[in-house]
């Protein structure tokens, strides 16, 4: 259904909906929740909240109000329920966002997330389309959370690598979002989540009418992610992502399979993927690297070629 005030809907597979309420203010609406990917309930709450809040940052906005979405089995201890909610609350406070209530239902397994409302100026909305030939793509978080959380279940990675992936997933995109909003000539932005870098890059490329080439050798990776991927520890979601983009992807002879696997890896609370001219990307990178030293240029956009995506 069309509405003149609906500035961003579901037609471009964007990260959130945006609705204009005045000439100065537009409301960003998004919702996200999932089952636990970690055993610690407080950490689960933090990660789920950071993941939900990320969509607002990807749209160029700031989150302001949220509602809890919680599904719990009867057997889940009350202390665990409390810890999940406290973890989510802690991230909301860090984001400057008020949790004003929510809804809880009984379910066979726990699920948690947020419905988030944010604000943005109608003229400063960032979308996942609009990349232009000559733009480079900047990624603000390393890849590998899907591979590593799969490896954790089999106790295959070191405690240090485990703690690092937990920290990455629980980190808000707030600082990165602030840096991106301050950057010049940002043409497109999205966050890298369940469809992996390949899937979200394809959505950006196809919606923008460009070809995006990703460079495997420049991808920032979480500690031990490459080792695990080379061992064949690849989550099922990565294969689904590869099937999704395969008709639209040219894999060049220089590509290494391990980097292709990690580009398809589904991310939880992943980083922002930003398209902007190279001359504007350099100062953005300098700002990002003051708090996210792994931030990197991972590809570039060009005039459309045979496929929307290329990987070398």
Placement of each model-derived feature along the sequence:
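Helix-biased detector of long, well-ordered alpha-helical tracts
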Residues: 1-312
